[in-house]
Amino acid sequence: MINKKISLGVLSILTAFSLQSVSYACTGFIIGKDLTKDGSLLYGRTEDLEPHHNKNFIVRLAKDNPAGEKWKDLSNGFEYPLPEHSYRYSAIPDVTPNKGVYDEAGFNEFGVSMSATVSASANDAIQKIDPYVKNGLAESSMTSVILPSVKTAREGVALIAKIVTEKGAAEGNIVTLADKDGIWYMEILSGHQYVAIKFPDDKYAVFPNTFYLGHVDFNDKENTIASEDVEKVAKKAKSYTEVDGKFHIAKSYNPPLNDANRSRSFSGIKSLDPDSKVTYKDSNYELLQSTDKTFSLEDAMKLQRNRFEGLDLKPLDQMALDGKGKPKSKKAVKGYAYPISNPNVMEAHIFQLKKDIPAELGGVMWLSIGSPRNAPYLPYLGNISRTYEAYQEKSTQYNDKSWYWTVSHINDLVAAHPKPFGTKVIDEMKGLEKTWIAEQDKSTKEISDLVVSDPKAAQEKADKISLDRAEKTFKRLKAIEAKLVKEKPKNKKGLNRS
């Protein structure tokens, strides 16, 4: 997410040691269907900003729009005409729309799924030639404008391209859209430049906040959508770079790789493929990664929970600080880095798409509202029309009826007291997920069969299953929260430590 800063403690560490105090945000991934054990396409993202930032999970119902009505982004002034009819879609919005809606991810009623965005930024030379447009298309509007307007993933990419061409982009972003025919990966590079590719089925990718596209065949119109002046702008900026005699997009548009992007690229690739030849010292990481391994949904969850397990790195948030929240010395920083699973993750989602799931369902979104570090991923089919009430609490401070705030509190308690609480919570969450994965295959098949003959009954069944599971899980999370509060260590005066 652009303009979404990491927590002050971590930011002060990065600033003090020149590790580049820029916006650190989401980490995305894609695993092509040829690389999964069950033939699923897997993709998703962690959404990062800061601790204690509420996220909701809702369904925006289909509606007719009056002629001339526009979408208006209160955070930057962007406007765009609404379609005559907006399609139903699920969303994961912020609760402060005046600062941006940030619908982030979901399915629409035609089975198009979308995750938007992973923020990135062009180098200074590029921005001087094709600067970002203040009231252009931003992450805050992306999902809200695209998902209710398109019937295929390619249509979604084409609509983004049209908007960026006509109105400009407010920021650099990486967007992923998918449907039953596959997934598109799109980089919005500068004010009016973009490139999108149909992602190969036999590759995987991990992408934090920098651009990754290398050489792209612009003549392959079936699998590529690109602005006309991508190369021209790079040449005019004098940042045009070739690799093996061919134009390289990332090397032409990126600033130097910073440490937070390096650590997440490296650890993400190694999480999926420990035998990968990438190193922590690589100057850049390619988007399209190859392997002879196959992956499961659990591997994707493990990736989003990664905190450098098995690597010679330690999470930055575990560093000992002085009384002012700063590192005790430069030497104390050595060996610490910014992980994918960090204190600023507000939610994480994984889309699981299978060829035999009807377009009316789209697939399954596995969703953790709140960081999945000590919280579960719950499955949601793309045809749901309602979400559990605890997902809809809009408070900007702790609220005991809120899913996000309950999970946030659990994460805070476990992080503050790792010795007594250990891995008890996450171990239970993984046990629940294992059960749900087995159950979901069965219910997805049943609802897939039903949707052909009776779409309304299929939707009602999907709603009931997901609502019942969410209610039961939330009650368990409240019990865990209460137990942790009761059992947390007390200070010398006998008071509970937060």
Curated annotation (Swiss-Prot):
InterPro entries: C69_dipept_A-like, Peptidase_C69. It is an enzyme of class 3 (hydrolase). The active site is at 26. One of its GO terms (molecular function) is dipeptidase activity. Its EC number is 3.4.13.19. Pfam families: Peptidase_C69 (PF03577). Keywords: Dipeptidase, Hydrolase, Protease. The keyword ATP-binding does not apply. It catalyses: an L-aminoacyl-L-amino acid + H2O = 2 an L-alpha-amino acid. Belongs to the peptidase C69 family. This is Probable dipeptidase B. It comes from Streptococcus pyogenes serotype M1.
